[in-house]
Amino acid sequence: MYSNVIGTVTSGKRKVYLLSLLLIGFWDCVTCHGSPVDICTAKPRDIPMNPMCIYRSPEKKATEDEGSEQKIPEATNRRVWELSKANSRFATTFYQHLADSKNDNDNIFLSPLSISTAFAMTKLGACNDTLQQLMEVFKFDTISEKTSDQIHFFFAKLNCRLYRKANKSSKLVSANRLFGDKSLTFNETYQDISELVYGAKLQPLDFKENAEQSRAAINKWVSNKTEGRITDVIPSEAINELTVLVLVNTIYFKGLWKSKFSPENTRKELFYKADGESCSASMMYQEGKFRYRRVAEGTQVLELPFKGDDITMVLILPKPEKSLAKVEKELTPEVLQEWLDELEEMMLVVHMPRFRIEDGFSLKEQLQDMGLVDLFSPEKSKLPGIVAEGRDDLYVSDAFHKAFLEVNEEGSEAAASTAVVIAGRSLNPNRVTFKANRPFLVFIREVPLNTIIFMGRVANPCVK
């Protein structure tokens, strides 16, 4: 069911680009940007956020965990909690589609939260079937109507929870920007909500006359926001005279392990890839107390906290006889939550490879397979809420995502010297051992809200 007031203008179709960019090395404080009203403390009545169109599912979809009494964390808004769970549902579904398109020996890394944020900014201007498909694919239709109607407000609250953290040892920062063609007038409501909720200011560029210079300007902005780690995210010739708008979301994370690995204990060991081949990886080692559990069919789950404890890395390692691909297919938000709930602190021997993953891909094919079809179609797309006067000739020509992850003994790629004393390798046969010498899944999550910020697969840590 839709509620909208729009005008339709027919002309040559113009392109909208979405870029969901992410850098993670391993995490200051980002405030909600540029408004006299503090979105982080505001209530819904304080800031009206009414997009052009609202979609309500005729029948609210039941979710697998509906009816279960999963406890909402203290000082957490119920609507923010719902949104976080919706993002987790999208994360696991999208990952499975992406994994199906990859070779088992390929590394994968992405930020589902970054992707959801970029498309939430697009949802602001969407109507009709385009809006419905956005709601369904990103699982926004699984949350209550009250949350759905004000989803951008609660996205702001979620961002405040995630990014407004004072922690000198860790850093989690998000930056958004709209790059629009300077010849066009953009919808004022779209601009206001984008800036207030997502901190996405509009920067005019000359796509018509200077497409290549515009591409270079956007890539430079991304490079600056990711400390030079992500460059040339927009490929050559991706921007032309028909481009109207480029939406960019970046997330940067850098953190130090709560319990660091000693470089003196790192040594070369074999890592066994999915195809049966092996490679020589730098295997880190430490003994300590960590949250751990051996779950269904011998799969091991380990949680490694970063300093501050709010953000952790979760590793999922199948037993040697079970392929990671099978675990990937079976994984749901409910299964993952069940495993996390079962974790218990115990003494553990941890062997983990040092690795670096860079991953970049178009989101278009996977999202189309998931049902987001109209948004990418020049004939069907309905995005009247972006350009002034209800102009309805826009579509998304492509959406790009790029990610970077580096893990080492300190946690981050910029390792500092440390005076922490860590025991060397021992031969205690009674200790439980977690040895990641074969493909494993990796999640980086914000613990209180259980928000999946990053996720991926380490299939080959030997790639340079």
UniProtKB/Swiss-Prot annotation:
Reported impact of A414T: In AT3D; type-II; Hamilton/Glasgow-2; reduces interaction with thrombin by 90%
Result of altering F179L: In AT3D; type-I
Phenotypic consequence of R79S: In AT3D; type-II; Rouen-2; lack of heparin-binding properties
Effect of M283V: In AT3D; type-II
Result when mutating P112T: In AT3D; type-I
Cell compartments where the protein resides: Secreted, Extracellular space
Post-translational modification (record): Phosphorylated by FAM20C in the extracellular medium.
Intrachain S-S bonds: C40-C160, C53-C127, C279-C462
Disease field: Antithrombin III deficiency: An important risk factor for hereditary thrombophilia, a hemostatic disorder characterized by a tendency to recurrent thrombosis. Antithrombin-III deficiency is classified into 4 types. Type I: characterized by a 50% decrease in antigenic and functional levels. Type II: has defects affecting the thrombin-binding domain. Type III: alteration of the heparin-binding domain. Plasma AT-III antigen levels are normal in type II and III. Type IV: consists of miscellaneous group of unclassifiable mutations.
Role played: Most important serine protease inhibitor in plasma that regulates the blood coagulation cascade. AT-III inhibits thrombin, matriptase-3/TMPRSS7, as well as factors IXa, Xa and XIa. Its inhibitory activity is greatly enhanced in the presence of heparin.
Family: Belongs to the serpin family.
Record protein name field: Antithrombin-III
Protein source organism: Homo sapiens
